From Swiss-Prot:
Name this protein carries in UniProt: Small ribosomal subunit protein uS3c
Coiled coil (UniProt feature): none
Keywords: Chloroplast, Plastid, Ribonucleoprotein, Ribosomal protein, RNA-binding, rRNA-binding
Family annotation (HAMAP family): Ribosomal_uS3_B
Family according to the record: Belongs to the universal ribosomal protein uS3 family.
One GO process term, biological-process aspect: translation
Organism this protein belongs to: Ginkgo biloba (Ginkgo)
Length: 218
């Protein structure tokens, strides 16, 4: 029987790096881990609230967190930083205030920086967010997937695989649809595979979107 494993965890330390960089004592480890998750959720919620309009999106690729004794460094890798707000400086300051209030700790410094992703549609998280917005706007899933593959191929990737599950186009019976472009060697450890899952909340229910992108080999 086949055994499934997360493609990112399977390659952790080979082609994938950790998103959190810190060390903690055993009794504080779970608290810091939960705090990292709350920081990421706070950033994602802030981005959604401050989008200029519904058709545009921030496109967060990943959030890296580094901790020191009295300092938390957060680096947001984002595809389209100009779509967030008009004044980026003021926006970062407001985001820092929101995160600090959520942490409820005045003894630690908080630094937040934004890094632009060079080829955003080559990142599965950004591409999945694009697909979800199209499906929520009732665009045909076949048309959406075809356009998504075209956008990904423009980012010089070697292969992409997309899975969408649920009541596609409002059909009564849920099903799973696949689409692939290029080569996606999931069993090759040295292959740089990026993967993500993203839910699309439509009027017919929730659709599950999974994307695998093959960038290159080590």
């Amino acid at each position: 029987m086949g055994q499934r494993i997360n493609p990112l965890g399977f390659r952790l330390g080979v082609t994938q790096n950790h998103r959190s960089h810190w060390f903690a004592q055993k009794k504080y480890y779970s608290e810091d881990l939960q705090e990292d998750e709350e920081i990421r959720n706070c950033i994602e919620n802030y981005v959604r609230r401050h989008m200029k309009n519904y058709s545009n999106y921030g496109g967060i690729a990943r959030v890296e967190i580094r901790r020191k004794i009295d300092l938390i460094q957060v680096e947001i890798h984002i595809g389209f930083p100009n779509l967030l707000i008009e004044d980026r400086g003021r926006g970062i300051e407001q985001l820092r205030t929101d995160v600090r209030n959520m942490l409820n700790s005045a003894n630690r410094k908080l630094n937040i920086s934004i890094a632009k992703v060079a080829k955003p549609y080559g990142v599965p998280n950004i591409l999945a967010e694009y697909i979800a917005l199209q499906l929520e706007d009732r665009v045909s899933f076949r048309k959406t997937v075809k356009k998504a593959i075209e956008l990904a191929e423009q980012a010089d990737i070697r292969g992409i695989q997309i899975q969408i599950a649920g009541r596609l186009d409002g059909n009564e019976i849920a099903r799973v649809e696949w689409a692939r472009g290029g080569r996606v060697p999931l069993q090759t450890i040295r292959a740089r595979i990026d993967h993500c899952y993203y839910p699309a909340k439509t009027i017919y229910g929730v659709l599950g979107i999974k994307i695998w992108i093959f960038g290159d080999e080590e």
